[in-house]
Structures are given as C-alpha cells and as structure tokens.
C-alpha cells in the first residue's frame, strides 16, 4: 500500500534549499515517482531546474510515513517561475499534473495535495484575480482526480520577500496570502499553512533548506487537522515492476 502526495506550484514547491545545510532524511518508506514507477526518494525530489534542491515534501512525507506506518510516494509536478495562468484548466502544467497523478493512482492512493505558488502573481494586475482563478483550478483538480475527500494544503508566501533586491517586486505578497487564507476558509478539505518567520536563501526569494524542513512540518500539522482518521484506503495492487529494485537504481 502506497499513499501518495501530489506537489504542484512554482519554485518554492519545487524546492531550492541547499541540501548540505540540513541532515538528510533516511526513511526506507519514502519513494518518488519516476517514469511511472516508484524509486527510493532522493534529492532533488522535484528536479524542474538545475537549481532544484531540498523540498518541503521530504519532512512532510517522513512524518506521514512514521505516523501511518505506510509507504509514501511523492508525485513531483511543481515548475519554477510559473504564474497562475500557466496552471489554468487545460494548460500544459495542469494536464501534466493530472496525468502524473492518474498514473501514480494505478499503484497508490493520493492522500494529500501540496500547493505553493504566488510569487509570480504579486504584480498589481494579477493579484486581484488570484483567489478567483485559484479556486477554479483547485476545484478542477478535485473533480478531475476525484479528490473531494483529500486535504489540499496551501502554503503562504515568505514574509522575507520585501527584502528582495527589487523591493517593490513582491510588495503585494500579503494580498496573495490573504487570498490563500480566504480559499482555505471557504473550500472544504482545504488548509492554509503560514510561512511566518521562515528564513530564505541569500536571494531573499526562496526558502532555505532549514526553512523547508520546518515548512514541511507545518504542512503536516495542517494536514492532521483535516484528514479523516477513519478513512479506509482502497487496496491498490503494486505490480512487481512498479517499485524499482536496488539494481535498477544504479
């Protein structure tokens, strides 16, 4: 039985933390989807760019696996630098995430969806429509993937963004965070995860590795508030070749 986690959003969901700054997570129950099969989790979990690194899903998955005593598979579909319009229903990113989730669902059951995005929508002409657009996208994911009873977790933008080298670039981040909170308050099975106090890399744009470890814990704490403790996951057959062998990993 594999419980899986879908990652969607932009670079802070992809993860830009420097792996050398944190202790690696060693847990044989953690896997990542590659080419339709599961292999032991490695870093970077979401290699969308050469700069990909530590990911918040690592600590989230570690806590989930330990509490539920199950294998946990991560479905990495985040893409750095993307604005909300690039995630609209029918877009390449939306369809890719749905395809990967459906593929993963053949050998696992999706237990949570983690979203972090919004830096690219801080511009004055974008943020006023953020809540409306994201609501449509999230509802479409739920319908397409039949995830009505699955927690969706929306992470807030870092409060360090005003320190970015272009001070006005992200001045509207508070409006994005408010939109995320509004959605969490009105959409069933949806939670908001605050990023208050989390530290950035030197670029003042991406969360540091240590911050991502903590952020993953916060995501999991919010997940615990939403999950149905009595939910029974349907048994999914895992073909012999669905999980890569040690030899195949070499």
Please annotate each region the language model reported.
Residues 1-250:
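Cell-envelope and extracellular/periplasmic
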């Amino acid at each position: 039985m594999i419980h899986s986690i879908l990652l969607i959003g932009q670079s802070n969901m992809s993860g830009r933390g420097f792996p050398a700054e944190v202790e690696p997570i060693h847990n044989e129950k953690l896997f990542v989807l590659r080419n339709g099969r599961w292999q032991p989790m490695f870093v970077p979990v979401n290699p969308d760019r050469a700069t990909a690194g530590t990911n918040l899903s690592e600590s989230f998955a570690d806590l989930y696996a330990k509490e539920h005593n199950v294998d946990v598979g991560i479905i990495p579909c985040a893409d750095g630098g993307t604005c909300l319009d690039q995630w609209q229903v029918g877009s390449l990113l939306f369809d890719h995430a749905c395809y990967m989730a459906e593929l993963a669902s053949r050998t696992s059951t999706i237990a949570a969806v983690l979203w972090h995005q919004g830096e690219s929508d801080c511009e004055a002409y974008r943020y006023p429509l953020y809540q409306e657009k994201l609501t449509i996208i999230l509802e479409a994911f739920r319908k397409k993937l039949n995830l009505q009873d699955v927690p969706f977790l929306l992470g807030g933008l870092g409060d360090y963004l005003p320190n970015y080298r272009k001070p006005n670039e992200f001045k509207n981040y508070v409006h994005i965070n408010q939109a995320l909170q509004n959605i969490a308050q009105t959409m069933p099975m949806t939670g908001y995860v605050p990023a208050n106090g989390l530290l950035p890399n030197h670029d003042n744009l991406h969360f540091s590795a240590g911050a991502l470890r903590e952020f993953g814990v916060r995501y999991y704490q919010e997940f615990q508030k939403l999950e149905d403790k009595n939910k029974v996951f349907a048994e999914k057959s895992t073909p012999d070749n669905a999980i890569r062998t040690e030899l195949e990993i070499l």
